[in-house]
C-alpha cells in the first residue's frame, strides 16, 4: 500500500515543478527607480547644497528644492510657487529666511508663499531645522525653520571665481544661472543672475495642464574687510516672475521682490565678548493675481485671451 501511494503522487509532483518553472520564466523586469536623499549628521537639522543636483532638474524655486528633504511635502498649484509643508504643517508655522532676513508672502490665500521669491542656486547652503527646539530661528516656531544662507567668501589674495549652468528640458523648460565673485584682502564683489521658465505641462493623454511659469533674479553684494576680524557688507536682490495655476481660476501674474540689507560683524573683541553683529534690511513684495492675463476666457461661446 505504501508503494502504490508513492507512485500515485509522483506525477503530481512533476506537474507542480513544471508549473513553477514556467512561472519563473514569465517574470517581468521593471525599470529601475532612483531615489535621491541627503545624508544626515544631525537629527535636528539638515544641510543642503543648492548648487548640487538633488533631482532630475534644477529646482525652480525654494519649495522645489525642499521636496528632497524627508518629511517635507509641497502643495502644488502649477509648475512653480508650491507651498512647502513640514510634517503636515506650513504657513506661519514654518519660518523661512533668506540671507538672514525673514520673508513673507503678500497673499492671504498663499498664492505667493515665501519660497516663491527664492532662487536656490543663488545661495550657498540651505539649513532645515526640524521642530521648535531652537531659539535662534524666530518666534512662533512650530513645524521648523528653513534658512537660505550666503557664506562669507575668504580672499587671502586677489582672485576671481566664475560659475554658471544652462538646463534645457521638455515642456519648454529653460534654466540659466551665472555667479561671479572677485575680491582681495580688503574686500570683494559678488553678483549672480538666474532665469527659469517652462511652458504648460502635458499629461499622458496630451491634455494641457495650466502650469507655465517664468522667473528672473539678480543679486549684487559688496563686502569690505578692513581687518581680519571686521566685515561690512551691503546686498541688493531683485526678482521678477509670473506663474499659471491649475488648482484655481486665478493666476499669479506678478511676483516682484526688491530687498536690501546691510551687515556689520566684529569678531574677537575681548576674551569674554567674541562677536558683535548688526544687521538692518528691508524687503518689498508686489504680488498681483488676475483671471485673464495668463489664461483663456470663455466669452459668448468663443475662447478669447486678453
Spans of features found by a protein language model:
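Acidic, small-polar-rich N-terminal luminal/periplasmic segments of exported/outer-membrane proteins
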Residues: 22-155
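Membrane-embedded beta-strand positions in outer-membrane beta-barrel channels/transporters
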Residues: 32, 83, 112, 125, ...
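Transmembrane beta-barrel domains of outer membrane proteins
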Residues: 65, 87, 129, 149, ...
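Flexible loop and strand-edge segments within Gram-negative outer membrane beta-barrel domains
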Residues: 198, 211-215, 229-276, 282-306
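Outer-membrane beta-barrel domain signature
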Residues: 73, 113, 135-137, 165-167, ...
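Short loop/turn motifs that connect adjacent beta-strands in outer-membrane beta-barrel proteins
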Residues: 24-27, 136-137, 153-160, 186, ...
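Periplasmic-side early beta-strands and strand-to-turn transitions of outer-membrane beta-barrels
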Residues: 147-149, 155-159, 163, 174-257
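Cleavable N-terminal targeting peptides that direct proteins into the secretory/outer-membrane pathway or into
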Residues: 1-25
Amino acid at each position: 500500500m505504501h508503494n502504490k501511494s508513492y507512485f500515485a503522487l509522483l506525477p503530481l509532483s512533476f506537474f507542480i515543478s513544471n508549473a513553477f518553472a514556467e512561472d519563473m520564466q514569465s517574470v517581468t523586469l521593471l525599470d529601475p527607480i532612483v531615489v535621491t536623499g541627503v545624508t544626515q549628521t544631525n537629527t535636528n537639522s539638515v544641510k543642503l547644497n543648492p548648487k548640487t543636483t538633488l533631482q532630475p532638474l534644477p529646482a525652480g524655486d525654494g519649495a522645489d528644492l525642499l521636496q528632497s528633504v524627508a518629511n517635507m511635502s509641497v502643495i502644488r498649484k502649477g509648475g512653480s510657487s508650491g507651498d512647502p509643508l513640514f510634517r503636515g504643517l506650513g504657513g506661519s508655522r514654518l519660518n523661512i529666511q533668506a540671507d538672514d532676513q525673514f520673508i513673507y508672502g503678500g497673499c492671504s490665500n498663499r498664492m505667493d508663499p515665501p519660497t516663491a521669491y527664492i532662487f536656490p542656486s543663488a545661495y550657498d547652503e540651505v539649513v532645515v531645522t526640524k521642530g521648535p527646539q531652537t531659539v535662534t530661528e524666530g518666534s512662533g516656531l512650530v513645524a521648523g525653520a528653513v534658512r537660505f544662507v550666503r557664506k562669507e567668501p575668504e580672499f587671502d589674495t586677489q582672485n576671481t571665481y566664475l560659475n554658471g549652468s544652462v538646463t534645457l528640458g521638455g515642456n519648454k523648460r529653460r534654466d540659466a544661472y551665472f555667479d561671479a565673485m572677485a575680491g582681495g584682502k580688503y574686500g570683494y564683489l559678488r553678483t549672480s543672475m538666474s532665469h527659469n521658465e517652462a511652458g504648460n505641462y502635458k499629461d499622458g493623454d496630451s491634455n494641457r495642464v495650466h502650469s507655465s511659469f517664468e522667473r528672473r533674479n539678480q543679486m549684487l553684494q559688496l563686502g569690505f574687510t578692513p581687518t581680519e576680524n571686521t566685515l561690512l557688507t551691503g546686498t541688493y536682490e531683485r526678482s521678477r516672475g509670473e506663474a499659471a495655476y491649475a488648482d484655481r481660476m486665478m493666476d499669479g501674474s506678478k511676483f516682484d521682490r526688491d530687498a536690501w540689507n546691510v551687515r556689520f560683524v566684529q569678531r574677537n573683541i575681548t576674551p569674554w565678548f567674541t562677536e558683535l553683529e548688526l544687521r538692518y534690511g528691508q524687503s518689498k513684495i508686489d504680488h498681483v493675481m488676475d483671471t485673464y492675463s495668463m489664461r483663456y476666457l470663455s466669452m459668448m461661446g468663443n475662447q478669447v485671451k486678453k
